[in-house]
Amino acid sequence: MPRLLIAASGTGGHLFPALAVAEALPGSWSVCWLGVPDRLETQLVPERYELTTVRAGGLQGRGLRKLVQLLQLLAATGRVRKLLRKQGIQTVFTTGGYIAAPAILAARWCGIPVVLHESNAIPGRVTRLLGRFCQVVAVGLSVAAKRIPGSKAVVTGTPVRSAFLSPQPLPRWVPCGDGPLLVVIGGSQGAVGLNRMVRGALPSLLEAGCRVVHLTGNNDSDVGELDHPNLVEQPFSHEMPGLLQHADLAISRAGAGSLSELAVCGTPAILVPFPQAADQHQEANAACAAALGAAVIVHQHAAEHRALGHALEQLMGPRLRGNAAASNPLIPMKQGMRKLAVREADQLLVTLLKQLIGAGL
């Protein structure tokens, strides 16, 4: 029975691709999960996989703080090493982030091969520093391969949950009507700024007959400020596959996970990169989609609602005015999104894991 450790923690961008890979593994595989206390994995993982947590963080501080973080990393690496030996782990799969550092270092210590997946166009710090210690660095976007020194990068795409890969119904609570559907994905980071610019641009669109689903995130005090029968606001939805598959257009941040979900659904997008994202990786992610004609980039700045309103008019206006399909700019954007998609990303990663175990590295 092959034994795999998955190290994935924190945000959905790290967690959901790892869950997609775990679901795609043969039933004969044994999976242990490594995470961090009090993060999203403690809610999603234990019902399916055995979860072990260790405290892990970055090394961004200085002086005493950095020393404490380094000692914490060493302690976490020691704990992971014991786990690897106790469980008889044969291969490690990680999606980067803080938890990847002790997992990669412990695996290196034990001589266990690692597959590291980097979903962003600009690799994270852990990937840049420790990718050289991994047997394979898989990347979601081909431009990332050039930015990973000392490692063999393989382009696999970024896995998405299986529901995104099969037809899903439109949720019943979506506003009824014949107007085009706009889905706004506020996200958990920086949702307030994005939501504010969206609300500044929506009134004319709603009056023209556009239906809007606005997923605001949990920390938006302005919910209810706009009241219109064509508008539904709620913090989040468990029916994202159905929403995106039926949406004519989405407004979203440019996290790699969100971008992959948009791509497999073929959903054109206005991307608003999170301004405080590390290394401006969301800007680089968005540029990859824009280069294929799949997305329009709007930046969050002083005149944000005017810029967003202009983009919405350019993209949704022809459909709202009933123009011929040939003049609809969303059609080539949909084709561009499909070019960005790698629908078999989970299977490609499973194949890499099988090859490592089969080679007995």
Swiss-Prot record:
Main location group: membrane
Entry keywords, A to Z: Cell cycle, Cell division, Cell inner membrane, Cell membrane, Cell shape, Cell wall biogenesis/degradation, Glycosyltransferase, Membrane, Peptidoglycan synthesis, Transferase
Catalytic activity: di-trans,octa-cis-undecaprenyl diphospho-N-acetyl-alpha-D-muramoyl-L-alanyl-D-glutamyl-meso-2,6-diaminopimeloyl-D-alanyl-D-alanine + UDP-N-acetyl-alpha-D-glucosamine = di-trans,octa-cis-undecaprenyl diphospho-[N-acetyl-alpha-D-glucosaminyl-(1->4)]-N-acetyl-alpha-D-muramoyl-L-alanyl-D-glutamyl-meso-2,6-diaminopimeloyl-D-alanyl-D-alanine + UDP + H(+)
Family to which the UniProt record says this protein belongs: Belongs to the glycosyltransferase 28 family. MurG subfamily.
InterPro entries: GlcNAc_MurG, Glyco_trans_28_C, GlycoTrans_28_N
Compartment(s): Cell inner membrane
Gene: murG
Species assigned in the record: Prochlorococcus marinus (strain MIT 9313)
Gene3D superfamilies (UniProt xref): Glycogen Phosphorylase B (3.40.50.2000)
Topology term for the membrane: Peripheral membrane protein
Function: Cell wall formation. Catalyzes the transfer of a GlcNAc subunit on undecaprenyl-pyrophosphoryl-MurNAc-pentapeptide (lipid intermediate I) to form undecaprenyl-pyrophosphoryl-MurNAc-(pentapeptide)GlcNAc (lipid intermediate II).
Residues annotated to bind UDP-N-acetyl-alpha-D-glucosamine: T11, G12, G13, N120, R161, S188, Q282
Superkingdom in the source lineage: Bacteria
CDD domains: GT28_MurG
Pathway it works in: Cell wall biogenesis; peptidoglycan biosynthesis
Biological process, per Gene Ontology: carbohydrate metabolic process; cell division; cell wall organization; lipid glycosylation; peptidoglycan biosynthetic process; regulation of cell shape
Protein name: UDP-N-acetylglucosamine--N-acetylmuramyl-(pentapeptide) pyrophosphoryl-undecaprenol N-acetylglucosamine transferase
Enzyme class: transferase
EC number(s) reported in the record: 2.4.1.227
Molecular function, one GO term: UDP-N-acetyl-D-glucosamine:N-acetylmuramoyl-L-alanyl-D-glutamyl-meso-2,6-diaminopimelyl-D-alanyl-D-alanine-diphosphoundecaprenol 4-beta-N-acetylglucosaminlytransferase activity
Xref: HAMAP family: MurG (MF_00033)
GO cellular-component term (any): plasma membrane
A Pfam family recorded for this sequence: Glyco_transf_28
